[in-house]
Amino acid sequence: MVKAIKVMLIPNNVQKTKMFQYAGASRFAYNWALAREKESYEKGGKFISDSELRKEFTKLRHSDEYAWLLNISNNVTKQAIKDACTAYKNFFKDLQKFPRFKSRKRSMPKFYQDNVKIQFSNTHVKLEGFSSSRKANKQKKNWVRLAEHGRIPTDVKYMNPRISFDGLNW
């Protein structure tokens, strides 16, 4: 059985900044993939698969103009591109309207975390890419505090973990 659990995180200021950077990179990757798909369709081309778009995006990440993307986990941008391709496919299957570009004002800041690399304890969660030190005494600083202790079960498999900002809390 698949069950959704939504919990509130209490990040410090450095972690909040990192989360907003991840959400911005996710929005950028989604918009970039949607623009590439739209451009290809207008030129009469076929649908570009998400694997091809991810390869192009990897080359884009390593260019000097987009060097800021190298500080972001690749799983965040990879899933955003997959989401854009899924939304585009659903439009052509008449399941949804045409996907809209995400804006800073209108869209909810959110991003994906890899379910293999995310770790949970009773009181904290460790997100991918937040570790800044390998020293044992500073490892706990990389963990984000949970508002509700013991809410997340630790002995289950996690599917598609997403982190979103609702305007007040993560």
Descriptions of predicted regions:
Residues 1-170:
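Nucleic-acid substrate recognition interfaces
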